[in-house]
Amino acid sequence: MMQPSIKPADEHSAGDIIARIGSLTRMLRDSLRELGLDQAIAEAAEAIPDARDRLYYVVQMTAQAAERALNSVEASQPHQDQMEKSAKALTQRWDDWFADPIDLADARELVTDTRQFLADVPAHTSFTNAQLLEIMMAQDFQDLTGQVIKRMMDVIQEIERQLLMVLLENIPEQESRPKRENQSLLNGPQVDTSKAGVVASQDQVDDLLDSLGF
């Protein structure tokens, strides 16, 4: 015996499923819009690549500053080494002369070499000072990167605040797990969840998430 066709019923069921999916999708979309989450999601999607670019900028600026400082140190080192070597040599020669005075010709040569050393010192110190200035100027990246990092911290804190507000406003009461009694005294003052913007520290954030079961 042939089975009766159930095609109309199948078509009716499929239509109901599609209708329900569409209704649920619309409800979810409306709920997101009412909660402001649609904009929050869009902002988060934009914030992630922006944060990545900002971090890359900080890395670049830090690397450039480090390279400039290292180059200046390497350039200054030979000048410092040369002055140190010449000064030690002249000091030893003068010590020897005072211990056993030499003839006039040798003394004149010692004086001439000493005067030449003194004449060369300003050039070495001037070059070194220029390199020190370059090292100091290389540290200006801290102002720029500091502003970038501060901006990123502000964005992260705002996202955290918004997410906490969503949890506080929408998590079902029965899903909140009671805090363990042995931790209640260790966590200090509890967060007043009836007021907006009261979460002021990371410890309070952790306590709040723990009390909500996360």
From Swiss-Prot:
Name of this chain's protein: Protein phosphatase CheZ
Function summary: Plays an important role in bacterial chemotaxis signal transduction pathway by accelerating the dephosphorylation of phosphorylated CheY (CheY-P).
Source organism per UniProt: Escherichia coli (strain K12)
GO biological process, one term: regulation of bacterial-type flagellum-dependent cell motility
Comp. bias intervals (Polar residues): 183-193
Subunit structure: Homodimer. Interacts with CheA isoform CheA(short). Interacts (via C-terminus) with phosphorylated CheY (CheY-P).
GO molecular function, one term: identical protein binding
Record flagged with keyword Oxidoreductase: no
Mutagenesis / variant outcome for changing F117S: Loss of localization to the cell pole
Effect upon mutating A65V: Loss of function, fails to oligomerize
EC numbers: 3.1.3.-
Consequence the record notes for mutating W94R: Loss of localization to the cell pole
Marked site (Enhances dephosphorylation of CheY-P) residue numbers: Q147
NCBIfam families referenced in this protein's UniProt entry, alphabetically: PRK11166.1
InterPro entries linked to this entry: Chemotax_Pase_CheZ, CheZ_family_phosphatases
Gene name of the record: cheZ
Any one Gene Ontology cellular component term annotated for this protein: bacterial-type flagellum
Tree of life domain: Bacteria
Protein's UniProt keywords contain Hydrolase: yes
Subcellular localization, as worded in the UniProt entry: Cytoplasm
Alphabetized UniProt keyword annotations: Chemotaxis, Cytoplasm, Flagellar rotation, Hydrolase, Protein phosphatase
Signal peptide: none
Family label: Belongs to the CheZ family.
Consequence when changing V205E: Severely impairs the interaction the interaction with CheY-P
Region called Disordered, residue ranges: 174-199
